[in-house]
Amino acid sequence: MKRRLSTLTLGALPIVVLGTLVTIDHVPGTDIDLTVPYAAEGPGPTFNTLGQIDGQDVVEIGGADVDKTRGNLNMTTVSIRSGMTLAQALSRWLFTDDTLIPLERIYPKNKTPDQVNQENQIAFSSSEASATIAAMNHLGRPVETEVASIVEESAAHGILQEGDVIMDIDGTAVGGPKQVRETVRKKKVDDSVTITYRRDGQKHEATVKLGKNPNDPTIPFLGVSMAAKPAGGITVDYHLKDIGGPSAGLMFSLAVVDKLSGGDLNGGKFVAGTGTIDDDGTVGPIGGIAHKVQAAKDAGAELFLAPAKNCSEAVSRDHDGMTVLSVDSLDDAIKQMDAYNTGGEYTTCKK
């Protein structure tokens, strides 16, 4: 910060004069854009996955007895500001802890902002599905893979229907959407897969000849989107809106486990964290973790769960008063929290 301020002082007059000009984002009377090709990335809001938002549980579970929970399991976010003038970008760099990053890292040239936002929403929905599967697997509860939608004129069109439950593929029981996707990915275009599915309580079997992926004709394509759901009538719904990306997976999964496990995973403490999660419970790295750690610290968290592969970046800034744990799976996160709460051995992130 001192280096930034001294730089500003040496050229104070030119920057002040320039600043008055570049607060305008277009040249008056023209379509000439004066915004800079950078975005400011900083700490975003945090949400308690054990709490409520707009009168609804952030993680709502039906069809099962739900245990009372204590404390916090907060998911964390980063804020992104784009469309800035030079003066606004300089202000973020000088007077905040934001990081300036090339706009192309947020919005690649070959994609529109709407496309990027849609991809982020899809990633967020996928993280919810994986969070549910990982939690059910940890708890030893069965899950089902349901057909959510079907692409018209695709291989599955006219064979599978929305609401069908895929039971096995090529003779192997299906434990989640990822298993179906991986089986199809190992095939070639025009290969066939045999799918056993349940519709209206009746078991059916069909052989489906795989088509071509619309985005890459060399990749086999079944043409269905799938959703994971717990078996036995249990439902899990997530009620956070206007948030994208897959990084809430770990915290969502922990919330589901906490509500169905009969114990306080967090020991009643304020725990925050981040990380993607796969169906098998593997926790993966995410972007902007230094800002997420800052957001958690500002919110009052005592403990932060960081993906092991993000550890050095997670503790690259001041986090005094908050312990940052290194976790690589859902099971590991639960064990580490228990060790922290009971005085056992746990693994912290190192620079």
What are these regions (language model features)?
Residues 6-25:
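Hydrophobic membrane-insertion alpha-helices, especially the h-region
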Residues 182-225, 316-351:
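PDZ-domain C-terminal substructure recognizer with occasional recognition of PDZ-binding tails
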Residues 34-65, 76-81, 96-151, 209, ...:
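PDZ/PDZ-like peptide-tail recognition elements
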